[in-house]
Amino acid sequence: MLLLINSANCQVAGFAVATVGWILTTTSMGLVEWRVWYIENNALMPPGLVCVGMWKVCVYHHVSDHNRVTLCQRYSYRDPNLPLDIRVSQNLLLIASILGLLGRASIIFALRNAYLGILRENATFNPFVASGILNLASGVCIAVTVVWNYHSVMSEHGISFPPSLSIPFKPNTQEIGSAFLVACLAAFMMLLSGVIFLSHKFSTAIQVHPQTSDM
């Protein structure tokens, strides 16, 4: 009993990491600064800044030193103008958010059982392990999105936006934005929480069933 409660106390740290990671995941989904395009003199639009997100794009035109015009337009998975990497990343981020939410629910259930003394080490279903697997899967989904976005920016891939936005296919220069960094941190924390849940479970199992030396 005491061993299980001590194990649960250690898992609280993993739960906190997973919670922050899940919050960062959902935050990165709503941010538009996944890719930052810098547009200089162009026939389609005046000099400005274009921020490309996973679900919308925003165009910023500087009218003066203190004023700027912002135009944002949302797009969906079925938008034919979207490249494959953005369409796949939309699904990966949604899956990561759902898996992270399920992982949090599983660890809450596990902590409740541990503190009530009804969690068994030899149970067929261990919510600690389930939470670790879910968080690892969530972290992998986010990591794939991050790597793919980074590759697209470094390779200077273009995007065919609707003509109404008057955005060129490729900018003069482009770079990764703040949403990329938020997603990187989210992926790290989700993976870390998954490792914490799984590794501590295995270390607890070793303590419960120690190896005995031959006499």
Named regions from a protein language model:
Residues M1-A8, L49, Q73-N91, N122-F125, ...:
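Juxtamembrane membrane-interface segments at transmembrane-helix boundaries in membrane proteins
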Residues L2-R35, I86-V153, A183-T204:
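Signature of small four-pass
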Residues V32-Q90:
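A surface-exposed beta-alpha-beta supersecondary segment
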Residues N41-L44, N122-F125, G158-F161:
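Short amphipathic alpha-helical segments embedded in low-complexity Lys/Glu-rich regions
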Residues L44, G117-R120, P168:
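Short helix-coil transition/hinge motifs at the ends and kinks of transmembrane helices
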Residues G48, S203-M215:
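Intrinsically disordered cytoplasmic terminal tails of membrane proteins
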Residues N67-C72, N113, M154-L165:
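Peri-membrane helix termini and adjoining interfacial loops of integral membrane proteins
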Residues R68-L82, E156, L192-T204:
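Alpha-helical membrane-embedding segments
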